[in-house]
Structure formats: structure tokens, C-alpha cells
Amino acid sequence: MHDFETLARMIINDDPQLDALHLPADGIFQKVPTTLEELTCNVAADLADLLGRHAGQVPTLTFLWGPCRVGSTALLNVFAESGFKAIYQPIKNLLRGRLNQQSKSDHSEIMSVFSLSPPWTVVKETSGPYTVAECLFNPLDALLRSGFPPSKVQLVVLSREPADMLASWTRKWSSRVSTGDLHAHFLLARLNERRIRRAAEQASIPVFNFTSTPGVEAVSAVGNLFEAIGLADRFEPTRLEGWGGSDPLCGSFSSVVFPREPKAFELSNLHDPLPGYGMGNLSLDRSSDFRTHEQIFVSHGLGELFGLAVETLSAGRDARNAG
């Protein structure tokens, strides 16, 4: 049983002991005990091996990150439809392989798809939902430890109305993770933004912020992002619509490269079919103030964790807005 409040305080205080903390196995998603440091070292080694197999010109890497259900796959598909190689959480795929004790031979599929194509490749990574390890793992740190040059990376931190994200977490995963743990994991995954941003700051990686935007404002929001990251000439509004397909594992995102997940993590219909970016039912909860959901967390003994997370995330947002 994790002390979630202690984990949150360690994140908030940038406690280096967090990486050495014992993470017990659950027998389903995580087969063996481990630490974040051990996972990071192992995944970085796997990445170095994969990148070495595709040695050559290093592309600019646009690195999308957010908590699960932030709208990252839909945004990734915009890049894919715009002609970029766009890979669905390749680093998390390696992490899950390590958690699930896959052998090296089981990495064959990710090896076949993990080629970063010059001059520009886009990947998306997320935090959560099944294990504390997934919530607190830092994929950007693993990438940098693999030897990928930070000068070729740009980070895009994604956000979405938290009440909508929580509703989506509950809708997709409440049958696979206990309600209390799922709510705690949700808050830890959001707090992990501090660790991601810190890794970028320490490596002098530029950071861009993007809010998943439904409806009529979606086109201008994505257009502004393309301009900010230096891709204004590649933006075409028509790429945000006309999506087809309803694959059980890939949804409507047929242009994205999807490495196959370890069996324990596969979930049919995780990706709802969308006709285009911002056109789905992105808003599942009409309450715009996430604090109105406090009682849900209190009922699961997570009141202190909720307060810590809301205060920390609000302070971070206010500081960025002031800057």
C-alpha cells in the first residue's frame, strides 16, 4: 500500500530519494518490485540500443507529454496527418515491457517502428494510469540518459480541463484499477508535470504549453502551436478533419505508429473514434472548477493528497501565467 501523500510531498519538494523508493509489484501490470531509478536506467539502455540501430542524422524531436486522457493522441494524429512520423508513447512501451518482465525478444516490434525520421519526428508520452511507476516515471529523463541530444528536443506540455480528464479516467479504467487507487494515480500523474518540466529546464530544452481545445477554437489553437514550434508552413486546417476508422486499439488514428502493448496493458476501445481534432465528446463534465470534486477524493481517504495537488498545480500555473 502506497502512502500517496508522502509521494506527493516528495514530488513537490523535488526529493531525490523519490527515485530510490521501493515500488512493490502488483502481480498484474508490475511483476517485480523496482525503483524509478532502476526503471529509468533500464529504459534508457533500451532506448540507446534502439537509437543505435537507427544511427544516422538526428531529427528534431517534438516531445508531447501530459497525463493520460489529456487529448495527446488526437494531437499526435494531427502531426501524423500533416506528414510527420508520429509515434505513440514508445518510451512508455519500453517501460511497460520492463514492468511486465518482457524479454529482449519481446521488444522486436518496438524495434521495428522506433526509427526517428529526419528532419522531424513527433512522439507522445503520458503518465498513468495503472501503477505508481507509470505515474511518476520521467520519459524525458530516460530519453536524455539514452544519449539523445537535448539540443534536438522541444517539449510540449499538454493540459485539459481536469474534471473532464478525471471523468475519462473513470470511464476507461474503473474496471481495472480500484477507485481509490485510480483517483490517487490521477493526481500523481498530474503532479509528475513538475518532474518533466524540471528535466527540460536542467537540459535547456524549450517548453511549450498547449491546452486541448474542443469546438470552433481547435483549429486556431493547433495553428498557434505549429507556429510556436517552428512548423507554421506545415499547418493545414484540412488535416484536422476527415479522419476515418474505428480500430479497437487505434481508434481513428490510423496515421499514427502504434507499437503493440504488452498484453496486460491492452485495452480495446481506449481511443474513441473521432471525425477530426476537437470534434469528439471532449467535455464529459461541465463543472469547470475541479475543486468541486474534492468530496470524491475525501471519500477515498485522499483529501490531503487532493489539497496538495490542487495547490501545487494552481501555483505552477499562476507562476507561468505571471511570467
Model-derived regions, located:
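PAPS-dependent sulfotransferase catalytic core
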Residues: 1-126, 237-307
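A structural signal for well-ordered alpha-helical scaffolds and beta->alpha junctions
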Residues: 72, 103, 159, 189-193, ...
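Short low-complexity, flexible loop/linker segments enriched in glycine and/or proline
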Residues: 101-104, 224, 250
